[in-house]
Amino acid sequence: MSGKIPKYFITELLSRTNIIELINTRLELKKYGKNYQTNCPFHHDKTPSFTVSNEKQFYYCFGCNAHGNAIDFLIQYEHLSFIESIEELALIHGVKIPFENTVQNSIYVKKQKLYLLMEKICKLYKKNINVTHLANKYLARRGINQNMIDFFLIGFSSLKWNEFYKKINISKEFEQELLINNIIATDKNGYIYDRFQGRIIFPIQDNHGRIIGFGGRSLNDMSPKYLNSPETDIFYKRKQIYGLYQVIKKCSKPVYLLVVEGYIDVITLTQYNIDYAVSILGTSTTTEHIQLLFKNTDIIICCYDGDDAGKNAAWKTLKKALPYISDKKTLKFILLPNQEDPDTIIRKEGREKFQKRIDNAITMSKFFFKNILKNINLSSDDDKFHLSVHALPLINTISSDTIRIYLRQILARMIGILDDNQFEKFLYEKETKNTQKTYFQIKRTPMRTLIGLLVQNPSLAKLVPVTMKFKNLQIKGLSIFLEILQTCRDNPNIHTGQLLELYRNTTIINVLKILARWDHMIIQKETQNMFLDLLMNIHDKILEKRREYLIAKERKKGLQMNEKKEIWSINKKLSKR
């Protein structure tokens, strides 16, 4: 990726980024000595093993080996690509990325144009609703007040595309891009039209509040009733959640998120001060949705219609969520009466009664067994067998030992395992998959320790005298040390996170990452002394090797006068040690 985004820009971007602040917006960090700690988000972590260093701008988990700088964190935590993580940081700091690659730059420019165009179209939709009687009549009938219209930027599309074209002032070239991306379309006569014409518009925003797409609801019998924007370079339905931006804007870490099915449901619940309602965009729940929801809350409450379709949707959601459930993260369910949805029922019952439904939501374990026991006769041995075969693979996908064993315990009692030995074996039976990971390790040597100290403390480079000569490059690891030393000298204020970023995708990056997290078992104030001692010892080793070479040469063919002076100088230096 270094050929696409200049290294100087990435280094500058990391210098503007405080990794503590970045991670703290997503995880709750607590100060521990000079570092910060929390439970690792990348594995089931019972005690805090995720450490973040403000000094090094680097994180490391002692449990699962996750590590890196601010860019790596966004890649791992947000499931972004390298370039997407750079774009995220650039957006946070309000800077433009100077792509070197013309293709990548054109993609970036195209995305920025799309954001701007979506914003313009949204404003036009919003302006249009204020002067459209039909749209206002519909919203009034649905009981949606002006505050909600403004808060969710609700609009209406009744204009022909040529009116958009004139008001937004876009080029023909970009109009073609919109056609290619299916944002606009052509009819059988070749006329361009707005896909949302005649619909109430619900703008969809990303986590920064940027408009990335729209949902449209028809006011007549037009099919389909609901229509979403086609996917583009900035809009992916399987990754977006309607209303999440509004929730996070009010509360950065809500106690729970209530997942409902429609745009109107979210808006009505918010109007009734249920400020944590969100919606999947008219599609089935994906693993990306589950991960995004759990990043923002510890409790997901899914509210579905009580008919068969709603129950099936809830069951599918639970199966998708099982691998992400932990001791702290869980799922609950509300199944509404038939022919009811959150919008209709809260208007009938009021907020207080609806809140009771939330408070009494069905727990994950109860919902799991309620569904798994459908059509099962527990007095039948065959049914017990089928129950076990069906339930165990699902239970085994749960990463939490506590929850997994608890569900197995319930299952064991159901199928009649009462013998203590059999029961114990059933509960703690090893998983078929090997969960142990093997990590790349390297042996400790003085040279690697020296490099490790420099990687962790780049400012130590100033302690190495410029006059100190390193002529013998055959000493293992010396070339790497000299390479890192020069990089630190060229970038006087560089920190560990920036240093590692400069070596991303190089042959030595894996070694450098290991050295960056080595514990040298010394107090901080002794770091400088240890570094200098190792430096002098290695320099002495270089001098000794050079002296051995010159002595061997003298025996074979003699030395030049300058080489004899060099031996004398080496002997003098070594005698002072």
From Swiss-Prot:
Domain of life, source organism: Bacteria
Pfam families in UniProt: DnaB_bind (PF10410), DnaG_DnaB_bind (PF08278), DNAG_N (PF08275), Toprim_2 (PF13155), Zn_ribbon_DnaG (PF01807)
Gene Ontology CC: cytoplasm; DNA-directed RNA polymerase complex; primosome complex
Domain annotation Toprim: ranges: 255-337
Zinc finger (CHC2-type) residue numbers: 40-64
Catalytic activity: ssDNA + n NTP = ssDNA/pppN(pN)n-1 hybrid + (n-1) diphosphate
SUPFAM superfamilies according to UniProt: DNA primase core (SSF56731), DNA primase DnaG, C-terminal domain (SSF117023), Zinc beta-ribbon (SSF57783)
GO biological process terms on file: DNA replication, synthesis of primer
Cofactor notes: Binds 1 zinc ion per monomer.
Names of required cofactors: Zn(2+); Mg(2+)
Keywords in alphabetical order: DNA replication, DNA-binding, DNA-directed RNA polymerase, Magnesium, Metal-binding, Nucleotidyltransferase, Primosome, Transcription, Transferase, Zinc, Zinc-finger
Binding positions (Mg(2+) 1): E261, D305
PROSITE patterns per UniProt: TOPRIM
GO molecular function, one term: DNA binding
Assigned EC number: 2.7.7.101
Function of the protein: RNA polymerase that catalyzes the synthesis of short RNA molecules used as primers for DNA polymerase during DNA replication.
Domain commentary: Contains an N-terminal zinc-binding domain, a central core domain that contains the primase activity, and a C-terminal DnaB-binding domain.
Family membership noted in the UniProt record: Belongs to the DnaG primase family.
Protein name: DNA primase
UniProt organism field: Buchnera aphidicola subsp. Acyrthosiphon pisum (strain APS)
Gene: dnaG
